[in-house]
A protein has these predicted regions:
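SAM-dependent Rossmann-like transferase core, predominantly class I methyltransferases
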Residues: 2-36, 42-55, 210
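Conserved SAM/SAH cofactor-binding pocket of Class I
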Residues: 29-101, 111-134
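Conserved Class I SAM-dependent methyltransferase catalytic core
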Residues: 16, 148-204
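SAM/dcSAM-binding transferase cores
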Residues: 201-246
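General small-molecule cofactor/ligand-binding pocket signal
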Residues: 12, 61, 87-89, 191-194
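Residue-level signal for inorganic ion chemistry
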Residues: 27, 124, 153, 211
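Mobile active-site "lid"/loop adjacent to the S-adenosyl-L-methionine
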Residues: 125-152
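A generic structural signal for alpha->beta connector loops
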Residues: 8, 57, 83-85, 164, ...
Length: 246
C-alpha cells in the first residue's frame, strides 16, 4: 500500500506494520482532545497528526514500541505543518513516564507536562486476543494483545491520565464487552459509546469508546453508518472527516 495523502499532511507507511485504515481515521476524527494528548500505539503517526490538526493549541506525544514505525512516524511529523507540536517516542506503554500521583496536575499544558500526564489519551489498540498469529512478527505485535493486554493498557492510562482527562479508543465489536469490563476493573467509567456500521443493514462492526475516572453526565450512546444506500460516504462520515479527506 502506498502513501496516504490528507488535506494538510501525508502519511508514508512502507516501513510500518499497520497501515492507514478506517479505524485510525475514525478515532482521529472523533476522539476528545485536550491541552496535552497521548497517542498509544502511534504507528504511522496518523492519529497523532489528526489530533494536532483538530486541536491547534495541543501538544501531542505518540508512543510505539516498533522502532521502524517510530522512525517513519517522525518523518511524517517533520514533513507536516505540526512538527513543532508532535513528538514520537519509541517505548512500551509500560515503560513510559508519569506516576499515579502526578494525575492530580493542574489542567494547563505546562502543569500537565511538568507532571508527565495528559488530559486526553487516544489508542487504536491491539485487539486479537485468541486468534492465529501472523507470520510477520511486527504485524502480529501491532494487532495482538500479547504486546499490550487490555489490562496493561488501562493501567497505563490510569497512571498517565489527569483526573479530569478522557481516554478514547476504537475496538472491534467482538471484543467491546471485554474491553469495557477491563476498564471497570481499573476504576474507569464509560462516558461515550459510538457503534459504527459499514452499511445500514449491518450490525456495528466497531465501537468508539470514551472513558473517564469519574461519572460524567449525560452518558452518550449512538450508532452511525459509514456508507449510504448508494455506496457513498454517509452524511455523518463526510462531516467528521471533512477536515482531512480531499
Amino acid at each position: 500500500m502506498g502513501n496516504f495523502r490528507f488535506k494538510q499532511f501525508e502519511i508514508e507507511q512502507d516501513r510500518c506494520a499497520m497501515k492507514v485504515g478506517t479505524d485510525g481515521v475514525l478515532l482521529g476524527a472523533w476522539a476528545q482532545g485536550g491541552c496535552r494528548i497521548l497517542d498509544i500505539g502511534s504507528g504511522t503517526g496518523l492519529i497523532s497528526l489528526m489530533m494536532a490538526q483538530r486541536f491547534p493549541e495541543a501538544e501531542v506525544v505518540g508512543i510505539d514500541m516498533d522502532a521502524d514505525a517510530c522512525g517513519q512516524a517522525r518523518e511524517n511529523v517533520m514533513a507536516s505543518p505540526f512538527r513543532d507540536r508532535v513528538e514520537i517516542v519509541c517505548c512500551r506503554l509500560q515503560d513510559f513516564g508519569g506516576t499515579s500521583e502526578a494525575a492530580e496536575a493542574s489542567e494547563t499544558a505546562e502543569g500537565l507536562k511538568a507532571a508527565g500526564v495528559f488530559d486526553a489519551i487516544v489508542s487504536n489498540p491491539p485487539f486479537f486476543v485468541d486468534s492465529l498469529k501472523n507470520p510477520d512478527s511486527k504485524r502480529t505485535m501491532a494487532r495482538h494483545t500479547d504486546s499490550l493486554p487490555f489490562r496493561d493498557l488501562f493501567a497505563g492510562v490510569k497512571r498517565l491520565l489527569s483526573d479530569e482527562g478522557v481516554f478514547s479508543a476504537i475496538v472491534p465489536a467482538e471484543v467491546v464487552e471485554q474491553f469495557v469490563a477491563e476498564s471497570c476493573m481499573l476504576g474507569f467509567y464509560l462516558i461515550r459509546k459510538c457503534g459504527v456500521k459499514t452499511v445500514e443493514r449491518k450490525q456495528p462492526k466497531r465501537f468508539m469508546l470514551s472513558f473517564a475516572k469519574h461519572r460524567i453526565s449525560p452518558y452518550e450512546e449512538h450508532v452511525e453508518t459509514m456508507m449510504d444506500s448508494q455506496g457513498n460516504r454517509s452524511e455523518w462520515y463526510r462531516k467528521i472527516t471533512e477536515e482531512f479527506y480531499r
